[in-house]
Every structure is written in C-alpha cells, then in structure tokens.
Amino acid sequence: FDYAPEDELKVREYLHFLEGMLEKKHSQLKVVNINLLQAVVDYLAERNFIDKAIQMQKAKGDEALIKALKGPLHMDKFAPYLVSKYATNEQDIVLMTGVGSVWPLLRAHHLLNSLHSLLGHKPVVLFYPGYYDGQAMSLFGKIPSNNYYRAFRLVP
C-alpha cells in the first residue's frame, strides 16, 4: 500500500482503525502487524548488538554503523527471523509498517523478495511511504529503485 510520505500520520491512524475493524468484523482472520523498526530493534537486542551499535555510531558515525549492520541484517538471516518471531505461517494476512524508519538498513525490495520464498502466496501488505508504479518503488518519492517486484498496488 503506497501512500504519500506526508500522509504518514493519517496512515498510522487508519491502520489502527483497520486492525480494530478486522478484529471486530472478521475475527476468524489471523492478522499480524509487523513494525519493521521494532522488529529490527528486537532482532539486534536478541543478538546483543544494541550497545555495540550505539557505541559504533558514536565513535565512527552512521555510515560505519550501516556498513557493520549489513551482515547481521542480511535478508538470509532477517527474513527467516521475521517469519519465526511473528509466526507468519500461522497468519492469514501479514501487515508490515515502518519501512521509512528502517531505511537504509533494510530495503523494501530485498525484504519482499526474501519473504516471497518463505511465505509463498500469503498476502503481505507493505505500508510504503512513497510510490509504486507496478514495476519500481520510490521511497519517500525521492529514492528511486529499478527493481522488479511481484507486487501490485492495493488501491490504484
């Protein structure tokens, strides 16, 4: 679900409403909302990387930290972690938020490609602050990507 970045607060509010509505009107559906920022923090904390990351950022800056976290946050490790932690195989729908908050540590197209092989045809709704034209995503409407996606726009 792509949306204008300036509508972030409206989307968060609507998502809260949507979750309540799904729980009320479709209680048989199992829906999980994965906030990617919280997932990254939890993942790093479980591996005792938080304090090290803070120290590295203070000592060497953002670029060094981003480079150092590429290995631990590689999709071969992080995508299976999400599937396991959030029991996504037991869910009917997976909602994902926080894409803008985790950039540039995580890239949406890498995440979607990795999850596709793990989740198969399970519906994943990625709340994306930017634009998707059917072929490429543009985070915040400013950061282009020319990757192919197996996605479609939820609301044309």
Q: In which residue ranges do the predicted regions lie?
A:
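N-terminal, charge-rich interaction modules
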Residues: 1-48
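Short acidic, S/G/P-rich loop/turn micro-motifs used as interaction or catalytic elements
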Residues: 5-10, 39-40, 68-75, 100-104, ...
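Long, charge-dense
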Residues: 30-75
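A short, acidic, amphipathic alpha-helical segment used as a generic capping/interface helix at domain edges
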Residues: 74-88
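Conserved P-loop NTPase "ATPase switch" module shared by AAA+ and STAND
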Residues: 89-105
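Conserved Walker B catalytic segment
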Residues: 103-119
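Short, flexible loop segments at boundaries between secondary-structure elements
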Residues: 117-139
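C-terminal functional extensions of proteins
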Residues: 133-156
